[in-house]
Design a protein with these regions (language model features):
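Ordered, amphipathic secondary-structure segments that act as subunit-interaction surfaces
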Residues: 86-95
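Helix-start/capping segments and mature chain N-termini
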Residues: 1-79, 96, 101-270
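Phosphate/pyrophosphate-binding loops at sites that engage ATP/ADP/AMP, CoA/4′-phosphopantetheine
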Residues: 80-85
Length: 270
């Protein structure tokens, strides 16, 4: 249940377990080098919590050569949720290492819970590949830039592609395709989203394993060979109705099945 305290403005931001000060907020402004994860909390629980903690720890080790204790992260999330007076929320955990610091500074941001995506999505392909795409990090100018251009052109999101029209990922989502028998993920450098990973795990558990294959905009591996497609992120799943001029059928039965698979993934108390 959401019981936001009216005297606590949202977003509610804490740094290392205390309300953000002006000095704290200079950290993300002046030292953008960092990483984050975004999650949806419902009744104090999170799907894939262990995956989020592992993501933060792996990125922290790679960027700062420091481990990140999962119990500390959970404690800070709980503290920020209590501070905001919410048990249903959108939560973002950012990790930074300001100059001279020996311990990672954690910024926890709490907002109202996000609604699941509504309606089928139209994607505009763009020639953009992220550096170190396996790390989820703030300040992605290219993704934001192309996302805005896609919106101006009447699309819902940008679809990132590598040289040769190789499909990698959505600007803020992972993309999956349906070949009539199984889910296919692009075999290309991309962020392994938590929702995508949960779907992979749960489909495998259900005896319907997904696959990785090269996917391109055109040619024998082109998107047009697939009857349906979908995107997913921490907010949920949504069907794709077109990529550029290639139309896809909205397979309601497929989306119900995938939604049920995702909803069946275990939830963990923060």
């Amino acid at each position: 249940m959401t019981t936001h305290r009216p005297d606590t403005p949202l977003p509610h931001i804490e740094f290392d377990g205390r309300p953000a000060t002006e000095e704290d907020l200079r950290i993300p402004v002046l030292y953008g080098y960092g990483h984050f994860t975004a999650l949806q909390v419902r009744d104090g629980r999170v799907r894939g919590l262990g995956l989020h903690l592992a993501r933060l720890d792996a990125a922290n080790r790679e960027l700062f050569d420091l481990p990140l204790d999962g119990d500390r992260v959970r404690e800070l999330i709980r503290h920020a949720l209590d501070g905001a007076g919410l048990r249903d929320a959108s939560v973002r955990v950012n990790g930074y290492l300001p100059p001279g610091a020996s311990r990672t500074t954690l910024m926890v941001t709490v907002r109202e819970p996000a609604a699941r995506p509504a309606g089928a999505r139209a994607l505009m392909s763009v020639p953009y590949a992220r550096t170190a795409p396996h790390i989820k990090r703030p300040g992605e100018f290219g993704q934001t830039y192309y996302g805005i251009l896609a919106g101006r052109a009447g699309f819902d999101e940008a679809l990132l592609t590598a040289p040769g029209g190789v499909v990698t990922e959505g600007a803020i989502t992972n993309i999956g395709f349906w070949d009539g028998g199984s889910v296919v993920w692009p075999d290309a450098p991309a962020l392994a989203g938590i929702t995508m990973t949960l779907l992979e795990q749960e489909l495998e558990r259900a005896g319907r394993p997904s696959e990785r294959r090269p996917v391109t905009l055109e040619g024998p591996d082109g998107v047009g060979r697939y009857p349906a497609a979908f995107v997913c992120n921490s907010q949920g799943l949504a069907p794709v109705r077109r990529i550029d001029d290639t139309a896809f059928a909205v397979d309601d039965e497929l989306m119900r099945e995938l939604g049920a698979v995702y909803d069946g993934a275990p939830q963990n108390t923060v």
